[in-house]
Amino acid sequence: APTNITYGHNNRSAQFRLPQNRYCIENRAADMTMNVYLALSMTISAAVEGIEKKIHPGKPTDQDLYNMTESEFKKLGIKRLPKNLLMAIEALKNDKLSDEVLGPVMKKSLLAYKNDEWERYHQAVTDWEVKEYLRLY
């Protein structure tokens, strides 16, 4: 899955892919665990905001992003998507567009649910932890 905020034409490593042989936009960062209604409403709202405010998306990125270094990302001005759920929660908290699109009640509820999910995730013991620490102790 893409890890950077980018778009490209036939680039499967970009967050948004605009295939040149079809009239469509693929959101490659979305996954099957998302709420499709919230994801679609935020994606469309962000697109509309970009059009209305004439926000230039930058140049398309058509090189393989999976093989680029951090310094190459910085040189091209490419930002990272959140690396984990906690970082995503913080990004959502600070996002002004989501205030408008989701409204205060939905946003507060979503943040509470995702914070609870993060806490439950950290209470689980993973297979890696069992294997790693049982061999040491």
Predicted regions mapped to residue ranges:
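Catalytic-core signal marking the mid-to-C-terminal active-site face
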Residues: A1-Y137
